[in-house]
């Protein structure tokens, strides 16, 4: 009996050294893979479980199949908690995927033709980000205190009489041939072969959008200061990971730590 008891306590000790994290395949799982060695050096094995949807990784975390997840931003998490009654919290912001303004029929943002058509995503969250970016570039003026809930109704000045064309987010890259400019989500830009380096303008790292839509590491409430959580956050916020993100994604994914 003595030997098997020793065996089981050793197994428990190693079992406790596995950190299981749910993530979207790109860039989240790729960034986690890059942090594996740093965690190994701390005595932890990192197990990454990939999800292609945005519901299961939160449910799996709530039901304790995962120790953490990394795929979402805070507004999504807060809404999820409200709708599902889950108690999940953010412990670190790792990166954001900047929106960019891309050239369509026109190439020069500074000399905008009057009546220019600009395609933006048509869902609330993404349209607000697009409008904030256009406002940052001085193309339109939004009401004071307009935030991540901005809509077309919040435009107070539009000197160039820009026509905002609302298109499903994934379709904006395709619509570039029909409009003067398009405002494209980082992930859809990458998927459609647009290079962020070619964007005429992108969200600044200190913009409201970058801070709001930073992708976060999430754990169950009460686990914020657990050893596993601290080890995971430490491994994801090193100079090495920062460099990995910058080199691999060339501006399409930007570290925010």
Label each region the model flagged.
Residues 1-18:
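Short, low-complexity disordered leader/linker segments with a strong preference
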Residues 79-91, 106, 178, 183, ...:
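Ligand-binding "clamshell"
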Residues 14-26, 44-50, 117-118:
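Short, well-ordered beta-strand elements
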Residues 48-59, 147-174:
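Short helix-initiation/N-cap motifs at beta->coil->alpha
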Residues 62-72, 116, 139, 160-163, ...:
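Alpha-to-beta junction loops
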Residues 125-149, 230-257:
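Ligand-binding clefts/hinges and TM-proximal coupling segments of bilobed small-molecule sensing domains
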Residues 98-109, 213-226:
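A bilobed periplasmic-binding-protein/Venus flytrap-type ligand-binding module shared by bacterial periplasmic
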Residues 91-140, 242-243:
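A conserved helix-loop-strand patch within extracytoplasmic ligand-binding domains
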């Amino acid at each position: 009996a003595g030997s098997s008891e020793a065996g089981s306590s050793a197994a428990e000790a190693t079992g406790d050294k596995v950190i299981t994290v749910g993530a979207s395949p790109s860039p989240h799982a790729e960034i986690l893979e890059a942090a594996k060695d740093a965690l190994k050096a701390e005595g932890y094995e990192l197990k990454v479980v990939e999800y292609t949807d945005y519901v299961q990784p939160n449910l799996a975390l709530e039901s304790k199949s995962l120790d953490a997840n990394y795929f979402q931003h805070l507004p999504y998490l807060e809404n999820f908690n409200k709708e599902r009654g889950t108690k999940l919290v953010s412990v670190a912001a790792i990166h954001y995927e900047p929106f960019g303004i891309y050239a369509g029929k026109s190439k020069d943002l500074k000399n905008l033709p009057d009546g220019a058509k600009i395609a933006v995503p048509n869902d609330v969250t993404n349209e607000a980000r697009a409008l904030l970016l256009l406002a940052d570039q001085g193309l339109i003026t939004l009401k004071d205190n307009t935030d991540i809930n901005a809509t077309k109704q919040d435009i107070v000045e539009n000197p160039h009489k820009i026509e905002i064309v609302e298109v499903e987010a994934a379709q904006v890259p395709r619509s570039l041939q029909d409009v003067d400019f398009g405002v494209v989500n980082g992930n859809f830009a990458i998927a459609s072969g647009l290079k962020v380096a070619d964007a005429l303008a992108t969200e600044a790292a200190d913009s409201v959008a970058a801070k709001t839509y930073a992708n976060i590491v999430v754990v169950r409430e009460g686990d914020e200061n657990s050893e596993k959580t601290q080890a995971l956050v430490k491994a994801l916020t090193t100079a090495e990971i920062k460099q990995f993100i910058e080199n691999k994604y060339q501006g399409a994914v930007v570290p925010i730590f």
